[in-house]
Amino acid sequence: MSAIVDIIGREILDSRGNPTVECDVLLESGTMGRAAVPSGASTGSREAIELRDGEAGRYGGKGVLKAVEHINTEISEAIMGLDASEQAFLDKTLLELDGTDNKSRLGANAMLAVSMAVAKAAAEEAGLPLYRYFGGSGAMQLPVPMMNIVNGGAHANNSLDIQEFMIVPVSQPTFREALRCGAEVFHALKKILGDRGMSTAVGDEGGFAPNFGSNDECLSTILQAIEKAGYRAGEDVLLALDCAASEFYHDGKYQLAGEGLQLSSAEFTDYLATLADKFPIVSIEDGMHEGDWDGWKLLTERLGKKVQLVGDDLFVTNTRILKEGIEKGIANSILIKINQIGTLTETFAAIEMAKRARYTAVISHRSGETEDSTIADIAVGLNAGQIKTGSLSRSDRISKYNQLLRIEEDLGDIASYPGKSAFYNLR
């Protein structure tokens, strides 16, 4: 038995300089697992609650000492002595201890840190790489990366309303070559922006954050960068968007302040359809407000057969909400953010539910990240097929890409890179 003998929670800083939670779990054998949790900027209203201290004079109220205290007291007492290899039972214990629907008592940040650290300790105890511990012998597929090379919206201080403009390398034979492609396009874009006298400063997720005149201009410039790097847009590299539409939905309208537009759900559907016709866009995330299910239905009926429509704020990694979306034919993909739900067991359940319905599952970082690379192992372990973990700069993003390189090397000849087939939800 891999008995838990010690648990230590601590407050550390994330990539934005805000506090977050880290946890160490020590097993009887001396094996240790360590995990740190991320934090989002644009968040869905139905996400599990991230417990913050609210003490204005300390970190602007964003301290996490309460969550850390929960780890070091209540949670520690509840799971001490449990078998670390019994992940589902451990997560069930955490859920029962919290006792709320949204993890507001203990905090999803406290619960997730423990859930992840236990899994890491158990994998180490078993002598298995984390991805293999998660997925067994079937874990062999690397994910297609959606690389956020231009940041807008809540992730940057510029005039772009759409939050993320991403490149998606799909023609390469390996993840290593796909990563190289992304890096070369990133550097080509930097050169283009520099030549135009535009900012090459980067946003929260490592992408550039210049002031483009429109979303159209931004996408056109990315196409130029793809070609400048020696690749073919629409063949080697596709595009993806994260609208984060809940962030600019006010008074029943989608208000694109950067373009001076106020659009109804039907008009915004037309707007996105026009972009998808003009550019090789394979995926659109949060194309409607999380509560605008009628708008989501319109968007799905219009674009759902040729564009991946990802629900992030819409589904918040929650199987109850995802089940309702599947039944109503809303979207065709779910974004998986481990801190939206708060335990690994619930995260894996959402991925499996999506797959059974032929929805894709895109494993995702948050805008506030750490060096923790667990999501890379989840992406491979669960054969998710797609990952979103930022641009080709900032070590908090690169740590996930580098872990995927190590995993691909470890898998050797059995490693596969799905390319366009990762989008099995499109017909």
From Swiss-Prot:
Keyword Methyltransferase set for record: no
Which EC number(s) are documented for this chain?
4.2.1.11
Gene Ontology biological process terms in this record = glycolytic process
Q: Provide the transmembrane region boundaries.
A: none
Q: In which pathway does it act?
A: Carbohydrate degradation; glycolysis; pyruvate from D-glyceraldehyde 3-phosphate: step 4/5
Binding locations of Mg(2+): 242, 285, 312
Q: Binding positions for (2R)-2-phosphoglycerate?
A: 163, 337, 366-367, 388
Q: Which GO CC terms are listed, alphabetically? A: cell surface; extracellular region; phosphopyruvate hydratase complex
- Spell out the CDD domains in the cross-references: enolase
Cellular localisation: Cytoplasm; Secreted; Cell surface
PANTHER family found in the cross-reference section: ENOLASE
Give the family from UniProt. Belongs to the enolase family.
Q: What does this protein do?
A: Catalyzes the reversible conversion of 2-phosphoglycerate (2-PG) into phosphoenolpyruvate (PEP). It is essential for the degradation of carbohydrates via glycolysis.
Query: What is the protein's name according to its record?
Result: Enolase
Q: Which organism is it from?
A: Burkholderia mallei (strain ATCC 23344)
Q: Which gene encodes it?
A: eno
